[in-house]
Amino acid sequence: MDIVDVLPLDAAGAVIVLWAVLGLLGLIMQRSPRLITNIIFPAGALVSLALAVTGLWALGEVASIAVLPLGLPDLPLHLRLDPLSAFFLILLGGASFGVSLFSAGYFRSMEGNTLGLLCLEYHLFLAGMALVLLADDAYMFMVAWETMALSSYFLVTTDHHVPDIRKAGYLYLLIAHVGAIAILLCFGVMQGGHGISAYTFDAMRAAHLTTFWASVAFLLALFGFGAKAGLLPMHVWLPEAHPAAPSPVSALMSGIMLKTAIYGILRITFDLLGAQQWWWGVLALALGLLTAVFGVMFAAVQGDMKRLLAYSSIENIGLLLVGIGLTIIFHVYGKDALAALSLTAALYHTLNHAFFKSLLFIGTGSILHATGERNMGRLGGLIHRMPWAAALMLVGVLSISGLPPFNGFVSEWLLLQAFLLSPGLPNSYINMLIPVAAALIALAAALAAYVMVKFYGIIFLGQPREQALEHAHDAGIWERIGLGWLALGCVALGLAPVFVIQQLDFVTQLLIGQGLGNSASGWLFLTPVDTERASYSPVFFLLAVLGVMLVTSLTVHRFYHGRLRRGPAWDCGFPAQTARMQDTAEGFGQPIRRIFEPFFKIESELPSAFDTQPRYHGRSDDRFWFALYLPIKQITEKLSSWVSLLQHGRIHLYLSYTFVTLVVLLAFV
């Protein structure tokens, strides 16, 4: 009997087919919603886990390539699985495993017809993202990209009967397709006019574009993928689409879909284009800094918990672009060790963000499911009614805040190390920019922790701000398992950075020919450059914290046992506290709103002097919307009104339009 070798690419292709089949089964079984939630979504989760295992399998392997007998006459579909694709498949499979398990419980209350269609869209969305990561020609890539975009649009507009949700979906689809046009133009530039067969990625690698055309391709890629990732100023769809979408969909979009754009930037910049220019890195670094600082500032003043997380995603995407920009700069100037360090930091943070942001988004789904409320100003005290959700979301909050020993600290620490270890470069302007960039990254990290204190404290601590919260219930069993898996991922990625970086070396070796091979001193200590400069051991840190807590507890019980008593604290005659006396989400963000006032468009309404029920109302709007997008909208409406003059209903004039067009084409074409 012949034994057929199964390649990782074969396994990844089988996963995509299984997701599509599960989606179709969900549509067929729409009259049995319990079967969809109890069988289809858990099965989809197992398929996700299989994809993550496939990615781990392929990470250290030689790239595998397949040509399918489908596509255009002279351009069959090409698939490729290399270490870069494998890394993002691990991210996709690992994060979607937890989200799919959570979805099995979250969507139980949805009606059968809607649930069946959502199940199809959900699994097509996953399949589309996987195909994006495996595509090895422009045609296959754009087909997968559009599959991902359209399926996510339909997921965002699940509750399409709500006008605001339809508007959010339209805005998302519009910006997604503007970005897709830029990506298509980028592929056209890299194809170099050599026929349809040159649209394969192998042909683009061998094209050797001039500096001018390579720069044009890079700018188009940065704009096109930046629109999907939420870079300034194409970020406006995120805070609209995420609140509109069901929470598991928000988790997939923020935790995974945004990373497909990062994948696209990495693939084109370091793989397809080959040599880079120093100013590409400066542009990416500056744009990333602006995106990170702007995103975290706006997150600080949000009252809607899902909008807050959406702006937080903008901040984290900015951090990723900062790492990519640093990598380009160091690589161009031959500082390959530091280029590997900054690229490793960016890749590590990409993986970390997939886990902790997915965890936080599905956690807000549990809160929304239990309370029916997204406004943090109406929540509070939920730690007593939702202890499981509170404990697991605390892991995500500590991770995104960059506190050791959780995963967010490792990637942010590596990024700061890349700044701190930066040598003198031949370009004096870059030498001046890097310290400023490091300071802004530190500011963004501090503000991110501030935002998460607000997020967790307002929602879970204190007293309930509404009477209805007394009846809130904790997450169900499927939801707890999904939350627990993602929380476990945050802890594991934080405690085992040496193992993670050893796997990331396969990716950095592919992209820049350099890894952090000597980044470990044993398996306990992470030393990015050498032990004399910086080292970090999350296990020792955790043991030290636990040791201090243990010694403190033993000391208290040894010397004060029997003399401790519990009682109300003396509060200087302060009366009984009510829920209205607590800090609000708006009040917590007030210092940021005032300090960075020029960045916001602030509108406020103050009560009159004789108002018997005075209330203060304020809002902080995005200046980009009013300065950029609103004028574009007004110009478009004006042009449309002029074009409408041609739509007068007179047939003979319509025929004359056709005749004039034909004459022009015959004359000039």
Feature map (PLM): residue ranges:
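Transmembrane helix-loop-helix hairpins at membrane boundaries of multipass inner-membrane proteins
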Residues: 1-14, 24-120, 193-208, 506, ...
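Membrane-entry segments of alpha-helical transmembrane domains in multi-pass membrane proteins
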Residues: 5-14, 77-91, 131-143, 278-283, ...
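Membrane-interfacial helical/loop segments at transmembrane boundaries in membrane proteins
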Residues: 64-73, 200-206, 337, 411-427, ...
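Hydrophobic core segments of alpha-helical transmembrane domains in multi-pass membrane transport
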Residues: 22-23, 49, 95-96, 187-188, ...
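Aromatic-capped, Gly/Pro-kinked transmembrane alpha-helices
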Residues: 499-547, 554-669
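Hydrophobic transmembrane alpha-helices and their helix-loop junctions in integral membrane proteins
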Residues: 98-141, 151-475, 497
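Hydrophobic alpha-helical membrane-insertion segments
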Residues: 42-56, 176-187, 393-405, 483-505
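Hydrophobic alpha-helical transmembrane segments
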Residues: 79-93, 211-225, 429-445, 522-549
